[in-house]
């Protein structure tokens, strides 16, 4: 059993696994002053929109949007064996992840299902040497920063606490907020606020930076398909940072509604909808999260079950659908080929960028080829649909020159 604690010093064994009452975010008052419409989501009161979902969606695609994602769980796993222990639970290569680099990964169940998807960063600190003492610079204690889904964080913490060894420590960074600055002008705006900090950063780089008295972790990543940054900040400074960023002409606050339509266009799955404990990484088209060497060698929870799917092929696959007309297909809509049901929609909506309905669905593997003509049932009507490659809108991550 892993040693674990929250930043305030509480042992996580005393934490409630589920939150019955709706919580508020550190920026709750800030959102309300900005005119946000607040709704319950993942146990928190969160802004679904400010000016309007389509306006905010298009602004993010054209300029830069600021999202409050403080509901998500920020965790730190530390200890000499941290990478080894995480590799028992995650199918990606953690030990080879270089300091300052981030990787998308999956928390796996023994059944081969997905307990959650997450981002993991090698946060091992560099300790500067001291010429007077004759000490050389060196890497400190191994540390891995993880961002998990808000609705699953308590389950994730319990799972990690149960399966990680006593030699590592799990810390829940409850006293930190998380802001995401996304869009083609995100770097321009952030560079104006924090000069020379992000100049050399590419997609999935992560740095620690003291902005005055604010200790920040800045990671070049996001959930929109655009270039952008996720900024972990002490909760007490979150409002001041949000004000500084929104003072830039390119930046506006953006709500959950646009976040969902942006990630749908980007072909990014939403946990609890497009991926669940009942879906495996192969069927979910997340094979890239299974590092080749670890896919072959195993040693991680769920490997045997996933290996069988890899060998036999998945029964269904997650695909994109472009739907004719203007009527969006929502989660649960059935997919047909003639009279035969061949799938089900897991996410769907109207794409402001493409100006047409799009969806993600699981369909029978034999019908998962790009260009396959299908039908989706919406309000008792069959709408023509075509299997499409994802992302629907090309990603614009900054990968360097």
Residue ranges and their predicted role:
Residues 119-120:
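Glycine-rich, Trp-frequent "lid" loop and neighboring beta-strands that shape
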Residues 73, 77, 115, 144-151:
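Short coil/turn segments at secondary-structure boundaries
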Residues 2, 7-40, 47-48, 123-401:
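Conserved, structured C-terminal
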Residues 80-116, 186-214:
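Internal amphipathic helical hairpin motif
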